[in-house]
Amino acid sequence: MAASRLELNLVRLLSRCEAMAAEKRDPDEWRLEKYVGALEDMLQALKVHASKPASEVINEYSWKVDFLKGMLQAEKLTSSSEKALANQFLAPGRVPTTARERVPATKTVHLQSRARYTSEMRSELLGTDSAEPEMDVRKRTGVAGSQPVSEKQLAAELDLVLQRHQNLQEKLAEEMLGLARSLKTNTLAAQSVIKKDNQTLSHSLKMADQNLEKLKTESERLEQHTQKSVNWLLWAMLIIVCFIFISMILFIRIMPKLK
């Protein structure tokens, strides 16, 4: 099915946003955020459009738009470590937006931002070390006077920052795992309650069917009994009528003889 005009406009704007995200932008740049907001509106309109694409295509568009939103939110964070952590949770698109792309542009932007945030973390660490007071430098170097910190110490401190970053990731992963376990427990409990309710409902329906069968049997038996009673009454009335009729005939025949 041919792409609609709305989808073509969305693809053009998405390609433009990916190109802007890959470029180096000023902190005051506002166009990309506005474009991403327009992408969200166009995506919502495309989901309810009469000639909307397949669900897989819409999901791919959603991933890319969510990636751009998450990237903009990560850029607003103050710490480079927070930016790097937020960047790791972003999921780039899996399919190129245009035919000219060999690799999805969002994946390239993801790798670029990861490298940039890692470089910022290293720069922040080096800048903090170079601005420390003289007494603190003496304590870490063990010699008198202000001397530059060795590369070995810098590497150790960088490893420490990365280790803290990894610990934070592990903590978040443990919390997510705990939430998943809690959700699984609640789901199993809900399933158990639903299963018991279904069993109770099935038992009630079975009892209702049994009672209906009993009621039907009793109704048939009562109907037969009623029919038998009516038959006996009818026969009794016929016998009485016959007896009266015969008696009248005999009475009529006997009466003249008596006269």
UniProtKB/Swiss-Prot annotation:
Its main location: endoplasmic reticulum. Residues 253-259 are lumenal. Residues 1-231 are cytoplasmic. GO terms for molecular function: SNAP receptor activity. GO terms for biological process: endoplasmic reticulum tubular network organization; lysosomal transport; protein catabolic process; protein transport; regulation of ER to Golgi vesicle-mediated transport; retrograde vesicle-mediated transport, Golgi to endoplasmic reticulum; secretion by cell. Belongs to the USE1 family. PANTHER family: USE1-LIKE PROTEIN, VESICLE TRANSPORT PROTEIN USE1. Component of a SNARE complex consisting of STX18, USE1L, BNIP1/SEC20L and SEC22B. Interacts directly with STX18. This is Vesicle transport protein USE1. The gene is USE1.
